Curated annotation (Swiss-Prot):
Name under which the protein is recorded: Glycerol-3-phosphate phosphatase
Residues of the site described as Important for substrate specificity: 204
Organism name: Mus musculus (Mouse)
Reaction catalyzed: O-phospho-L-tyrosyl-[protein] + H2O = L-tyrosyl-[protein] + phosphate; sn-glycerol 1-phosphate + H2O = glycerol + phosphate; sn-glycerol 3-phosphate + H2O = glycerol + phosphate
Positions that bind Mg(2+): 34, 36, 260
Length: 321
């Protein structure tokens, strides 16, 4: 039994067999997928994943894609989905299925800065993040390299700031520097300047067990220096689900979240009362699930999926015939 494999909880973390998958899919209208580690690894689709999603589309299931990656626009993600064989809308509707932290951060600022004339944000992040902000009318400054100017703190603090910056947005930024951190702190000395983080992922996993520092490390650096707490947009924050819900009109009882990370994907699903499926093609393992099940911490128990699969391709038999 899968329950024994995952830790003995009689109601949670059941292996999703073809028979169980048929029953589950009959109760579900919408499936929300994480991307990296679930649908693909880098530029390679998980074997069988494109066929599974095409079969779900053919069955009339509504699909959404929720990613903490802020380095691509939703249009760029839609192009990748099509390029790797997952299908999806084209033309003016391309990207409408994708809810990334770049896009959702832009929605958040549009809400919070409503009524502010010509809103402006200092962005520690990617051109894609800046592009999504610009698309909703928020001017972005700060993207790209920024090295220290001068010989010491007096020189660094003398560097001119952009006027009227109303938000500091921290995403994945390979050009993160002490100069940028210093500027962010200076902007945040204004009490009406918002601090927004795209996500709190501590690591970005790579192939062969390697990893690099994630966006959460950068957000924490700004929080500590500014002595401010960021508003977090991405999983497991409810805000990113609210973005999906507002555009899709989702019924949580008929929605499933599919992901490879317990602390983001599965926790989001649990928080938002969704059914959850863990796929073992990415970050989290059954040993991680077992540890959470055996913990006395109720927060960790929220990071236990309803079901698990070795790969989302395991859903395919339930969709055939």
């Amino acid at each position: 039994m899968a329950e024994a494999e995952a830790g003995g909880d009689e109601a949670r973390c059941v292996r999703l067999s073809a028979e169980r998958a048929k029953l589950l899919l009959a109760e579900v209208d919408t499936l929300l997928f994480d991307c990296d580690g679930v649908l693909w690894r880098g530029e390679t689709a998980v074997p069988g994943a494109p066929e599974t999603l095409r079969a779900l589309r053919a069955r009339g299931k509504r699909l959404g894609f929720i990613t903490n990656n802020s380095s691509k626009t939703r249009t760029a993600y839609a192009e990748k989905l099509r390029r790797l064989g997952f299908g999806g809308p084209v033309g003016p509707e391309a990207g409408l299925e994708v809810f990334g932290t770049a896009y959702c951060s832009a929605l958040y600022l549009r809400q919070r800065l409503a009524g502010v004339p010509d809103p402006k944000a200092y962005v520690l992040g990617s051109p894609a993040l800046a592009a999504e902000l610009e698309a909703v009318g928020v001017t972005s400054v700060g993207v790209g390299p920024d090295v220290l100017h001068g010989d010491g703190p007096s020189d660094w603090l003398a560097v001119p700031l952009e006027p009227d910056v109303r938000a500091v947005v921290v995403g994945f930024d390979p050009h993160f520097s002490y100069m940028k951190l210093t500027k962010a702190v200076r902007y945040l000395q204004q009490p009406d300047c918002l601090l927004v983080g795209t996500n709190m992922d501590n690591r970005l996993p790579l192939e062969n067990g390697r990893f690099i520092a994630g966006t959460g490390c950068l957000v924490r650096a700004v929080e500590m220096a500014a002595q401010r707490q960021a508003d977090i947009i991405g999983k497991p924050s409810r805000f990113i689900f609210d973005c999906v819900s507002q555009e899709y009109g989702i019924n949580p009882e008929r929605t499933v979240m599919v992901g490879d990370r317990l602390d983001t994907d599965i926790l989001l699903g649990s928080t938002c009362s969704l059914k959850t499926i863990l796929t073992l093609t990415g970050v989290s393992s059954l040993e991680d699930v077992k540890s959470n099940q055996e913990s006395d911490c109720m927060f960790k128990k929220k990071m236990v999926p309803d079901f698990y699969v070795d790969s989302i391709a395991d859903l395919l038999p339930a969709l055939q015939g």
